[in-house]
Amino acid sequence: MAKGGSLYIVGIFLPIWTFMIYIFGKELFLIRKYQKIDSTYTALSQRVKEQYDTSRRRNYFPKVKLSRNSYDDYTLNYTRQNDSDSFHLRENATILMLVRNSELEGALDSMRSLEDRFNNKYHYDWTFLNDVPFDQDFIEATTSMASGKTQYALIPPEDWNRPQWINDTLFEERLRVMEDEGVLYGGSKSYRNMCRFNSGFFFRQSILDNYDYYFRVEPNVKYYCDFPYDPFRVMRLKGKKYGFVISLYEYEETIPTLWDAVEEYLVASEETILRKEDSAYAFLTDSGLVGKHYPVVEANSDYNLCHFWSNFEIGDLNFFRSDEYKHFFETLDAKGGFYYERWGDAPVHSIGVSLLLRPDEIIHFDELGYFHSPFGTCPASYAVRLDQRCRCKSDDESVIDITPHSCLMRWWKNGSGKYFLKEEQDEI
């Protein structure tokens, strides 16, 4: 009975053991199979990594340049400097921010973005301007954020405040009308002070006397890409006097008589400034078809309303200090348009540099991704975006470069042109 019982138990469990051994063997087979597949793909991945290792290290396509507006054959090699380099020669330049104490958080955001993308390698000075004294919190926080020296200056009242010759009654009336009409910043007094200061007084501040170049930065902006070069060095080596990244149309209701004042200046200065054909005058007046687009606004004067967006600008301070530019500004300022209307510093700068500089002295930094609400710019080339670790999409709705609202194509046509591809990289 016991023997028969044992046989019975064996008979019951033998199929179970056999099944378990089968399952275990099958699982072991699958594990080994997947290990083999994983090993195969690991080896393949390693070969791909080694094949494109130079791309991973951001020396992308060393024999192809997708644009050469700023880093051309005789300025900078396209291959970027190794990020591990601990020393970079600096130009005689400063990063400049006009900012209020209340804008500290926005200032820190902009500083962090520019430090990460550019200045942590160069340690350029940061210069901060304000019409009231900076408080200790602002000074401590910005000093901590900067990789270079920080310095702070109080703008003299005579450089900031509304001049005494402005008719207060007319000014208040124009302020009320523009606010009622919904003009952007139409009712703001401080905004007018800022625009006039940026147009004709920022370069007169004594704290800037020892610098040759400035890089204007505003609070709450973003720099999307690593800078592949030092833009200050490009400015010096190529003899550039003004650099921009975005160009668009101005609101005509803010500058209804600006071009009238410019035309008076042109007549009075005809013998002392560049001939129209030698300057970028056509950029300001061309209203024809460019690509698929006519100007989005039909202007009421010969001025097509195109301007360089001055919240990002890199400039030669010695140009703005020149008698030619100061005469240009003072002629316009005497009209009172900064207060009776709402003239912005962007069209004033743009008209000034377009009339007083040759087109080849103005540079479009087309590799530098940037955003200032509501518009941005992003390199169109996928390879460039990879190389510069950009965090933007060239087809994003905020990117304005070749949209109907942009004047960039008009600059390509009437300014310094645009290069799209050059096959060979010459040595410098």
Curated annotation (Swiss-Prot):
Classification via Gene3D superfamilies: Spore Coat Polysaccharide Biosynthesis Protein SpsA, Chain A
Show which residues constitute the signal peptide: none
Give the stretches traversing the membrane. 4-24
| Sorted UniProt keywords | Glycoprotein, Glycosyltransferase, Golgi apparatus, Membrane, Signal-anchor, Transferase, Transmembrane, Transmembrane helix
Q: Specify the domain of life of the species encoding this protein.
A: Eukaryota
Q: Which InterPro entries match?
A: Glyco_trans_15, Nucleotide-diphossugar_trans
Could you tell me which residue ranges are on the Lumenal side of the membrane?
25-428
Q: Which GO annotations describe the biological process of this protein?
A: cell wall mannoprotein biosynthetic process; protein N-linked glycosylation; protein O-linked glycosylation
Residues with glycosylation annotation: 77, 82, 92, 167, 414
What name is this protein filed under? Answer: Probable mannosyltransferase YUR1
Organism this protein belongs to: Saccharomyces cerevisiae (strain ATCC 204508 / S288c)
